[in-house]
Each structure stands twice: as structure tokens, then as C-alpha cells.
């Protein structure tokens, strides 16, 4: 059937997005101008070298051929930012590149070391020494971090003024390329509104500017930013200094985000020229998505007694699972849900709470991961957001769910489907690991990984969102992983959507990766390629490792293919049936 994409403003959520607002350049390739390369290795460190020193020894050996670095030590330019190990004994390292002490946007690397101390693979993007000479703007910005924040909020304010509130559902038919059928997209943002900042207008007079080496961050009072079209930041605004590769140039920029909920939810990342204050690139990154639940099913869950009532608070998992209600307003987290007798009658709250616990348990038992960040992060959810709000989203710190369209004809409460809850919380996992840019192919990978995990949590079928979409139509859903074309998604790379809507097709092109995952798990013959399925258990272990340990923020589909195959080799052996199936599954989808 023809799919309707609902969205209330320029943010990419569970169901889709509005075209991104003002942007100095619009490219499906996204903000990161660097494309990672993948190398398989079997380099063995000397026996006297162990731990992090294996990584440094490998990079020093490869610094000219792999990194394009000759005259300086790799330790001067690269920093290890994270290290993990998996159940097969492989250690995974994440690194970032710095030039003149300033991080380079998108210049990230992952290196993988086997249990015997051998480097098995490398994935990364770097700025070589010739390119570093293009950093002609130096290290000192001509505008302050507070001015960059102001520029971002002023642009967002202008864009939000043209948008409806959450009481409205807006849509506009848009013809898409024949490879992606017709969709109905919500379109409201004005793509020509790039606003400059007059320094005399800057009202962040109470902002405190903090400097840490070459990184300048601004902690602006929310009341000051709120003067701009009454926008109230959900987190303290900050701007970080980066070098940004653009063509042959290496620009000095600030990277900042606008994160607001009123008058409508918006989370946009801005890359702002640190010399003239112009917006180099921007894109939206809101990630969409005993008592009775929404479907009337009874379930048990953990609450906390407080005086004469009970709170929807679980203190047994990580740092807790807490569920609030926004009472159909647009403020979060809202009010903590309570009940007098511990027999709960808020189905949306029950499901959000129970399914958050289910997702926590899934990650803990399947992958040994302690919550979204791996360190027990509290899982906070808000239900009853807005009025007739047809979406769900992860805003970087918590989950928020709308109640659907009100009469239940198209959508019921979004917390009523465990694969939707798992999908959205997995956006949080991605943010703490690969941090895939929510644009173009990297954004489609971001969406696909959330679909993979959300679907595996429920394991009912190969559909996404079928429990909350068109409840009166049996078998209807938002997406199908086994047959993406049922819901206007491509299932082969030859049909890749190359337009700019939906952040470059993040919800569209995810169908290609979903199909590859389905073939890996279930098997089948597709486009003349036969894949012997390895089962869901092995398939999800491979994808989890590939997406959390191997990929970097600007990874594309070819990187995902290499990462999935390498993860299969590391987990099950280089000549294993799993590794063969992983390669075949991507052959099948192009």
C-alpha cells in the first residue's frame, strides 16, 4: 500500500522527515566530506608489545602508506577515544585525528586486535599531511562560540515559525524517482533561510565561555537563548571547534546543535564557519520511532513504592528506568507516573516502561551491554507527548512517544510496539558507539541498525511497527525487512534513492541493508545470488559487532559490507559458513 510519512517539523523520527532547513550546501553524501576505507590485516606486533601499544606500533608502521603522515609522530595526531572487547576476544579501538590540536570532522578510525595480539582490520578516514597544509585559517576563530550558538538558534527560530504545532498533521505529495515509488512527505521547512548574525544583536551576555586547549565551549543560560523566538534549549548549548574538510579546503568551524521541544521538537546539527559565521552545513538529527498495555495485553513490570503510592520507576536495571507523562503538552520529561494500588491503567505508560526494561534486558543478555551507553545510563521515557502526535523520537537523552492520531484509525500510542521502543533506544546505542551521521548512506545505516535490533527484540515476524500502525488492518506495517518494496523502500543498491528528501533517504535506503540482514538470517535466492541463512542469533551478533565496533560516523554501505564480513570472520572464523553468508548477503543486494 502507499505509505504516508508523517512529520511535524524538520526532524527525522521513526516515520520520516521534512526536508532539512537552510543549508549552504545540500548533498546526499552528508556533512562528513571524508569516506572511510577498509583494510584487512594480519599484522602481528612484537611479543614485547601489548595493549594500546599494539595500536601505536601498527600505526607507526603504516603511517605513511595508510595515514599519509610522514614527518610527525602518530601520537601527536591521533588519540584513542574508546576501547572495548567482544566475546571472541577481539579488542576494538576507536580513534580520532587532530591537526594543530583541533579535531578533524569525520576523521575517525577503528582498529581491531585479535586475542593473540594481531591487528585484523582497520577502517578509517584521515587527512594526510598534504591536505593539512590547507588549514590556512589557523587555530584562532574570528567569531566566538556564543556567536555560533546564536546563529544556529536564530536560523532554527526562523524555520520553526513557519511550521505547524503538533496538533496539525501536514503532508504534501512529492514525486520520487521511479526506483522508490511515490511517497507522501511532510514538507514545511524553507530551504533558503540562512541567517547571518549581527554581533550587536547578540544577547548571550550572561554566557560563560570555557576553554579547554583548542576546544571552546559555551554554556549559555537557557533564559538568554529563550529570547530567540521563545526557544527553550533542552540541553545547555555548546559549540566545539573543528577543522572541516570541504573540497580542497580545511575550514575552521564550530559544530553546535539546537535541541528544543517547543513549539515543536527539533534537533539540528550546524557546522558554522568560525571566521565569517556562515552556515556551512546543517541537518536534522532527532531520531525517530500488572497492567494492560496499548493492545490490551496484561504484563508485569517493576515499580517503586513511595509513601502511599507507587512510581513507574525501576531501580533494578542499571541506573534505573523511569517513565513520565507529558499530559499531552510539549514539555519533557513531564510528570513521573504514579498509581495508588500498583494496578496501572495507563496503557501507553505501561508499555513504554515494560518495553524499555525488555530492551535493557535484551542488550544485557545478548551482548553484555549495560544500557544504552554501556555504563548503566538511566532509561527515561515520556508518553502522551503533544496532541495527536504521530511519532516517537530519541532526542539524545530520552525517549518520547506520541499517542497517535486520537481515533486509532492510522496510529495508536507509539509505545505499544516493542520493536518501535527497541528501534528508538538503539538510536541511543548508535550515538554512543559509531555515531553514524544521520544523513545519506550513513543515516540509512543508522536506521537499519535500529530496525535490526528492534525487530530482533520482538522476533514476531519481519515487520516494523505492525502493532501500532493501522490496527484494524491485519498484517499492515511501517516497513518490511523481508520485502522492503511493500512499503516503498528499495531492496537493491541499483534502486538507491539519491534525492535530498528524508535527509537523503535515511528511512528509504535502509531497506537495502534490512534486506541483506534478512537474507543473512533466513537465507534465500535474490538477484541470482543464493544465501544460506545462519539464523537470527548469529546474524544479530554479527550486526551488533559490526555497527558498534567497526563503523565510524561517516561510514557508507561499502564500509558496512566490509564491517559485517570482518565481524563474521572475527566471531566465527575466516572460512566459516557465517562469513561466507555475510559476503553473499551483500552480493545479493548489490
Swiss-Prot record:
- State the name under which the record lists this protein: Bacillolysin
Active site residues per record? 424, 507 (proton donor)
In which residues is Ca(2+) 1 bound?
A: 339, 341
Residue stretch(es) of the prosequence: 25-286
Question: What organism is this sequence from?
Answer: Paenibacillus polymyxa
Signal peptide extent: 1-24
PANTHER family referenced in this protein's UniProt entry, alphabetically: BACILLOLYSIN, NEUTRAL PROTEASE B
Gene Ontology BP terms: proteolysis
Write out the annotated subcellular location.
Secreted
Q: Return the cofactor note field.
A: Binds 4 Ca(2+) ions per subunit. Binds 1 zinc ion per subunit.
- According to its UniProt entry, what is the function of this protein? Involved in the generation of beta- and alpha-amylases from the large amylase precursor.
Q: Could you tell me what reaction this enzyme catalyses?
A: Similar, but not identical, to that of thermolysin
State one Pfam family annotation.
Answer: Peptidase_M4
Q: What is its EC number?
A: 3.4.24.28
Give binding positions for Ca(2+) 3. Answer: 466
Amino acid at each position: 500500500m502507499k505509505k504516508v510519512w508523517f512529520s511535524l517539523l524538520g526532524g527525522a523520527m521513526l516515520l520520516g522527515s521534512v526536508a532539512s532547513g537552510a543549508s549552504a550546501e545540500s548533498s546526499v553524501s552528508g556533512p562528513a566530506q571524508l569516506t572511510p576505507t577498509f583494510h584487512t590485516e594480519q599484522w602481528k606486533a612484537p611479543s614485547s608489545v601489548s595493549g594500546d601499544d599494539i595500536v601505536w606500533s601498527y600505526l607507526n608502521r603504516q603511517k605513511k602508506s595508510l595515514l599519509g603522515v610522514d614527518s610527525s609522530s602518530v601520537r601527536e595526531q591521533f588519540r584513542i577515544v574508546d576501547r572495548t572487547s567482544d566475546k571472541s576476544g577481539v579488542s576494538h579501538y576507536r580513534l580520532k585525528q587532530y591537526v594543530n590540536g583541533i579535531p578533524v570532522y569525520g576523521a575517525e578510525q577503528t582498529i581491531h586486535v585479535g586475542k593473540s595480539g594481531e591487528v585484523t582490520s582497520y577502517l578509517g578516514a584521515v587527512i594526510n599531511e598534504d591536505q593539512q597544509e590547507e588549514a590556512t585559517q589557523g587555530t584562532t576563530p574570528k567569531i566566538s562560540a556564543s556567536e555560533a550558538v546564536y546563529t544556529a538558534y536564530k536560523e532554527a527560530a526562523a524555520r520553526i515559525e513557519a511550521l505547524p504545532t503538533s496538533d496539525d498533521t501536514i503532508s504534501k505529495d512529492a514525486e520520487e524517482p521511479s526506483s522508490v515509488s511515490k511517497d507522501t512527505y511532510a514538507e514545511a521547512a524553507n530551504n533558503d533561510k540562512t541567517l547571518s548574525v549581527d554581533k550587536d544583536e547578540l544577547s548571550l551576555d550572561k554566557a560563560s565561555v570555557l576553554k579547554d586547549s583548542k576546544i571552546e565551549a559555551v554554556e549559555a543560560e537557557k533564559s538568554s537563548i529563550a529570547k530567540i523566538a521563545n526557544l527553550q534549549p533542552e540541553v545547555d548549548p555548546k559549540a566545539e571547534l573543528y577543522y572541516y574538510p570541504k573540497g580542497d579546503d580545511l575550514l575552521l568551524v564550530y559544530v553546535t546543535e539546537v535541541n528544543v521541544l517547543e513549539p515543536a521538537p527539533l534537533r539540528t546539527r550546524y557546522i558554522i564557519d568560525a571566521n565569517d559565521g556562515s552556515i556551512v552545513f546543517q541537518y536534522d538529527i532527532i531520531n525517530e520511532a500488572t497492567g494492560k498495555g496499548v493492545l490490551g495485553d496484561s504484563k508485569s513490570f517493576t515499580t517503586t513504592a513511595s509513601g502511599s503510592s507507587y512510581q513507574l520507576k525501576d531501580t533494578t536495571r542499571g541506573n534505573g528506568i523511569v517513565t513520565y507523562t507529558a499530559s499531552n503538552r510539549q514539555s519533557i520529561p513531564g510528570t513521573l507516573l504514579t498509581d495508588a494500588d500498583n494496578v496501572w491503567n495507563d496503557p501507553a505508560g505501561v508499555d513504554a516502561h515494560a518495553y524499555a526494561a525488555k530492551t535493557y534486558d535484551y542488550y544485557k543478555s545478548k551482548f553484555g551491554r549495560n544500557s544504552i551507553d554501556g555504563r548503566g545510563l538511566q532509561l527515561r521515557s515520556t508518553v502522551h507527548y503533544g496532541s495527536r502526535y504521530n511519532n516517537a523520537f530519541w532526542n539524545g537523552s530520552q525517549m518520547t512517544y506520541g499517542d497517535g492520531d486520537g481515533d486509532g484509525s492510522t496510529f495508536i500510542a507509539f509505545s505499544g510496539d516493542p520493536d518501535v521502543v527497541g528501534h528508538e533506544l538503539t538510536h541511543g546505542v548508535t550515538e554512543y558507539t559509531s555515531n553514524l551521521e544521520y544523513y545519506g548512506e550513513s543515516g540509512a545505516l543508522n536506521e537499519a541498525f535500529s530496525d535490526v535490533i528492534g525487530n530482533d527484540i520482538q522476533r514476531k515476524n519481519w515487520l516494523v511497527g505492525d502493532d501500532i500502525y493501522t490496527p484494524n488492518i491485519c498484517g499492515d506495517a511501517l516497513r518490511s525487512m523481508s520485502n522492503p518494496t511493500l512499503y516503498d523502500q528499495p531492496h537493491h543498491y541499483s534502486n538507491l534513492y539519491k534525492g535530498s528528501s528524508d535527509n537523503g533517504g535515511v528511512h528509504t535506503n535502509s531497506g537495502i541493508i534490512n534486506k541483506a540482514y534478512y537474507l543473512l538470517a533466513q537465507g534465500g535466492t535474490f538477484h541470482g545470488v543464493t544465501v544460506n541463512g545462519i539464523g537470527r542469533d548469529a546474524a544479530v551478533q554479527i550486526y551488533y559487532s559490526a555497527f558498534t565496533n567497526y563503523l565510524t560516523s561517516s561510514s557508507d554501505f561499502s564500509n558496512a559490507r566490509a564491517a559485517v564480513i570482518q565481524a563474521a570472520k572475527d566471531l566465527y572464523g575466516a572460512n566459516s559458513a557465517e562469513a561466507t553468508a555475510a559476503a553473499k548477503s551483500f552480493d545479493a543486494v548489490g
